[in-house]
Design a protein with these regions (language model features):
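N-terminal basic/disordered segments at the start of proteins
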Residues: 1-40
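A short linear-motif detector with a strong N-terminal bias
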Residues: 1-4, 10-12, 39-41, 73-75, ...
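Residue-level signal for well-ordered alpha-helical segments
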Residues: 2, 8-10, 44-45, 49-52, ...
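Residue-level detector of functional hotspots within protein domains
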Residues: 8-11, 17, 80, 84-86, ...
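Generic serine detector
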Residues: 9, 16, 21, 28, ...
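A general structural signal for short secondary-structure junctions and capping/turn motifs
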Residues: 12-15, 21-24, 50-52, 86, ...
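Low-complexity, highly charged intrinsically disordered N-terminal segments
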Residues: 25-39, 45-102
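Active-site-proximal beta-alpha core segment in soluble small-molecule metabolic enzymes
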Residues: 87-171
Length: 171
C-alpha cells in the first residue's frame, strides 16, 4: 500500500480548484485556512477537535468574514488599478448579487465592509428585492434590479426609490 502524501490530500480535496490562497494542506495532511491578512494558518482538524471537546458535532458551518473582506478589497483594487491604467474617469461600483448567498451574516458582512468600496446589491426577484431593501442601510448605495419584472416588482422598486434608495432597473 502506498504511503499517503500531502499531494494526495491536495488532490483528494481539490485545493487547487477552489482554495485560492485561503486554503491549503499543511505538513500533517490536514486542510488549513488562512482567513486573515497576517497569514495565520488555522488547522480545520484542530477546530473540529476543539468543537468535539465542547460536544459540538458535525455538520458544522464555519464562516470566515475576513475572506469576504479580502475579496471585496481585491476586487476594488483590481478595478481601481485598471481605471488608473486606462485613465477611466467614471466611478466604479462593486455589485453583489444577493442570490449568491442570502444568509444574513454573510450579507451583513459584505455590506458592512463594502461601504468604503461603493458596494451595492443586485436583486433578480421580488423576494430578493425585499431582502435587499431591508438590509441596504446606506441610501447612496446602489440597488440593481435585474431579472423578471412584473408590475409588483417594479412598484416595489419605485417605492424603494421614494424611500431614498438608489434604484436602477435593468431593462
Amino acid at each position: 500500500m502506498k504511503k499517503w502524501t500531502i499531494e494526495d490530500s491536495q488532490e483528494l480535496y481539490n485545493i487547487s480548484g477552489w482554495g485560492t490562497s485561503y486554503f491549503g494542506i499543511n505538513e500533517s495532511g490536514d486542510v488549513y485556512v488562512t482567513p486573515c491578512k497576517d497569514n495565520t494558518q488555522v488547522d480545520l482538524r484542530d477546530v473540529m477537535d476543539e468543537l468535539a471537546l465542547r460536544d459540538v458535532t458535525p455538520p458544522v458551518l464555519l464562516r470566515f468574514p475576513d475572506i469576504l473582506d479580502n475579496r471585496i478589497e481585491k476586487t476594488s483594487s483590481c478595478f481601481e488599478k485598471a481605471r488608473k491604467e486606462y485613465d477611466f474617469k467614471a466611478e466604479n461600483f462593486i455589485i453583489y448579487p444577493i442570490k449568491v448567498n442570502q444568509m444574513q451574516p454573510v450579507v451583513e458582512e459584505i455590506i458592512s465592509h463594502g461601504r468604503k468600496f461603493n458596494l451595492g446589491l443586485e436583486a433578480g426577484s421580488k423576494p430578493e428585492l425585499h431582502a435587499v431593501i431591508a438590509v441596504q442601510c446606506q441610501s447612496d448605495s446602489l440597488i440593481i434590479c435585474n431579472g423578471y419584472k412584473d408590475q409588483s416588482y417594479i412598484e416595489l422598486a419605485l417605492l424603494a426609490q421614494k424611500m431614498g434608495k438608489r434604484i436602477f432597473i435593468v431593462v
